[in-house]
Structures are given as structure tokens and as C-alpha cells.
Amino acid sequence: MRELPSDIDTVIVGAGPSGLACAIQCQKNNKPFLLIEKNNRVGGRLGSFNENGYIFDLGFQVYNTAYEVTNSLLDMGSINLNYFKPGAVIHDGTDFQIISDPLRDIKQVFGTLFSDISTLGDKIRILKLKSSLRGYEIDRDNSKDKTTHQFLLDTGFSERMIEMFFRPFFSGIFLENKLETSSKFFKYVFSRFNSGLASLPENGMQSIPDNLLKNIDGKNILLEKKVVKIGEQ
């Protein structure tokens, strides 16, 4: 059995992106730590697997280039990001329609304006929301918290816009489809998608946690071990 360090100050449970970031900070500050992960890989909800020559991503499907903290921890030049145009292609049950940001992709301005996924009021509200959340910082938001769904209703978005765009798009980010996630987190994510670009590493999303892992001493990581109890020895 592997011998564990005896002078651990910090135990980090889970080697997802947050756990890896914590481990990197502990190492930078010379704080003894142990990172424990139940799976045989790091990344948590951020990962990939290969089968028959194809890469299949697990959990989160894209990386947002506007996440400053993560960018500062990654070697961005080595993960070879490929970028998507800003916007979304939505199937309304009959045809595909485009909702794009006309301020960042002028070629799609007419397709966006004439899309019946949203009302004219919805389109105006999107632009107003985009403007109001420019430079948004979640720790400076003193507004009353509520669910994302309630926030969208209070902002005036139509049910069709919520069901056809917000729910499917943000369900893939929140990993829950009722939009019960905090409206403050929604505002943070929305603001970042409007300032950055959705991207995909050339070799799949697993490239991101693997890149973070390079900054951590392997002797401080324990894979395929599940934490079942936390208490005094």
C-alpha cells in the first residue's frame, strides 16, 4: 500500500477543476496537501474518452475563454483551442434557426432579427442584459438571490425564449434542467459568454484537467480512492 505523507495540512476531496486549482495554490504556497480522487483520472465533470478513433467529451462540452482565473493556471498554448462563432443554432421542431450576437457576428444579424425563436422584446432584452452585465463580478452583486428561471421571468423574457434557448443552453452548463441555479451564477456565466468565446481543445476537454495536473507534484495525488467519512482519527 502506498505510504501517505504524514505532515498534511490540507486534504482536497475531488480532482475536478476546483480541486486541481486548490492543489496548485497549496503547492505554490508550500502548504502540505493531499488530493484524493475516486476515479482513475482527474477532471471530474470535465473529461473525455477515446473510442474507435473518436473523442467523446464528458460533462462540460466547451471551454469559455473569458474565465480569467482558469486561463492563468493553464498553459494556453499547449491545449490548442478551436473556437466557435458566438451564438446558437436552435431546432424549433421544424427547422434550424440562428440566434447570434449581431455586435460580434454581423453576418448573422438578419437571421437573428427574423428568427421567431424569440419576440422583438426578447431580442431587445438580450441586448439590455448583455450591456448591464458587462464587467459583472459576482462578489459585488448585492441584489437578492433567486433562481435563474425566476430571474428570467422577472426580466421579462417570454416562456418560448426561456424554453427554446435559455433552458437547453444553460442546462448544459448548470448540469440541471430546472434552472434552479443561482441567478448570480447565471449572470456571471452569461457575462463571460458575452465577452469570451466558446472553444474546444483539439484533443478534447480532458486536455484541460490534464494540463492543470502538470502543475501538481504526483506524490500529493491519490487516484481511485473514495472518501467515505470525515472525522477525527
What are these regions (language model features)?
Residues 45, 182, 205:
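Conserved donor sugar-nucleotide recognition element shared by glycan-biosynthetic enzymes
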Residues 71, 75, 80-179, 195:
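Mobile amphipathic helical/loop "lid" adjacent to a hydrophobic cofactor/ligand pocket
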Residues 46-66, 123-141:
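Glycine-rich active-site loop/strand segments that organize a redox cofactor
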Residues 185-233:
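Helical element adjacent to the flavin cofactor pocket in flavoenzyme catalytic cores
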Residues 27-51:
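Glycine-rich FAD pyrophosphate-binding loop
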Residues 5-35:
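N-terminal Rossmann-like FAD-binding beta1-loop-alpha1 element of flavoenzymes
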Residues 62-66, 70-76, 209-220:
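N-terminal Rossmann-like dinucleotide/flavin-binding domain of flavoprotein oxidoreductases
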Residues 32, 54, 80, 219-222:
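Conserved beta-strand segments of alpha/beta enzyme cores
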